[in-house]
């Protein structure tokens, strides 16, 4: 009898890991989905705005969720530079600094260059992509591929595309901001076109100009950027690499203009739903988060009226308000310090749970591939 009981305990001990403690699936691809300023309240408001009900966004149905602290070094409230640097390098830095350590002094002194998740992917031979509906040298996309002490140095940021530290650099880069980027470079006596020619990397002025079979392409537009088309085009190109890929897609969810910001977040969520059908989730990690939160609050309202009822009248009386006060919503036009949502599905998503520093997202992505820093 004792022998039988001992045997049963051994069997249970062996079976337990298989019952739910198994290792997370290893990822081939990682897609980082970044809603800039898309805090928890903004995600909630987007659902109420888009569907007149809570919990209707696709990302709100994902099985693995957590909350991420976004505080930078030396402050409670983060900007996009410090917030995204923490996510893609695993190290916190100061506001205004892009993928350099906190020893940097903004605009005055370089700090320690930090290795980004994109650079790890490049080093391993994966394909890489960066897409944003904000200027492609703005702090969030820039943190993936550049190291500078001042986020406003757009020309210097862009030229780092042509001098990669690992691999052959970003394969797919799509976004707006062309005029301002070229102006920034000219003020710093930098020649973008000459650098592009020297590296044999043409810079297209629209997505339509990109050759349909291109594995590597840079497209920087002036206006009319289509995030949906850009993301699908990038996935088509990056998926050709049998080793896998890293792709960061950013959408502007700032709600200083509530109508525009919430519309963009609803549209981004729909795009994410489409992306999930285009990839194999058994080998792809989808990771949704924000670089920082924003001071938006749903303070009233009822289901029989649109969330933004009264906004047009408010705008008519306050043409350029920093703050918005309507029956259901209040917005103070600034970043805020509360935690932001982290949601995940696919390979390695099990690592997303509970409260975490934003630096942990870097570790989650790295671990999904089975890599170590």
Predicted regions and their residues:
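A post-motif C-terminal structural segment
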Residues: 27-29, 35-85, 94, 107, ...
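Positively charged n-region of N-terminal signal peptides that target proteins for export
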Residues: 1-5
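His/Cys-centered metal/cofactor-coordination and adjacent catalytic loops
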Residues: 94-111
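Glycine-rich phosphate/pyrophosphate-binding loops
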Residues: 113, 117-119, 123-142
């Amino acid at each position: 009898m004792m022998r039988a009981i001992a045997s049963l305990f051994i069997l249970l001990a062996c079976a337990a890991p298989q019952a739910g403690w198994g290792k997370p699936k290893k990822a081939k691809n990682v897609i980082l989905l970044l809603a800039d300023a898309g805090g928890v309240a903004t995600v909630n408001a987007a659902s109420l705005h888009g569907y007149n009900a809570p919990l209707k966004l696709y990302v709100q149905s994902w099985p693995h969720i957590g909350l991420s602290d976004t505080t930078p070094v030396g402050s409670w409230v983060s900007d996009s530079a410090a917030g995204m640097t923490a996510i893609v390098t695993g190290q916190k830095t100061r506001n205004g600094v892009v993928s350099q350590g906190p020893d940097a002094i903004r605009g005055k002194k370089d700090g320690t260059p930090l290795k980004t998740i994109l650079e790890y992917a490049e080093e391993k031979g994966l394909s890489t992509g960066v897409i944003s509906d904000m200027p492609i040298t703005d702090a969030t996309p820039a943190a993936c591929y550049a190291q500078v002490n001042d986020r406003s140095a757009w020309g210097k940021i862009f030229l780092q595309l042509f001098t990669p530290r690992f691999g052959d650099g970003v394969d797919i880069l799509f976004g707006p901001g062309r005029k301002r980027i070229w102006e920034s470079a000219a003020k710093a006596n930098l020649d973008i076109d000459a650098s592009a020619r020297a590296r044999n990397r043409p810079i297209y002025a629209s997505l339509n100009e990109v050759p349909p079979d291109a594995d590597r392409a840079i497209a920087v537009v002036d206006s009319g950027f289509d995030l949906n088309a850009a993301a699908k085009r990038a996935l088509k190109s990056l998926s050709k690499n049998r080793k896998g890929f890293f792709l960061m897609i950013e959408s502007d969810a700032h709600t200083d203009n509530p109508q525009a910001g919430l519309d963009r977040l609803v549209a981004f969520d729909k795009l994410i739903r489409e992306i999930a059908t285009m990839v194999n989730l058994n080998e792809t990690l989808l990771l949704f988060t924000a670089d920082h939160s924003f001071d938006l609050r749903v303070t009233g309202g009822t289901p029989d009226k649109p969330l933004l009822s009264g906004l047009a009248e408010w705008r008519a009386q306050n043409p350029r308000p920093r703050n918005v006060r309507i029956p259901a919503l209040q917005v103070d036009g600034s970043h805020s310090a509360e935690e932001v949502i982290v949601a995940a599905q696919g390979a390695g998503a099990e690592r997303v749970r509970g409260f975490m520093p934003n630096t942990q997202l870097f570790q989650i992505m790295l671990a999904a591939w089975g890599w170590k820093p």
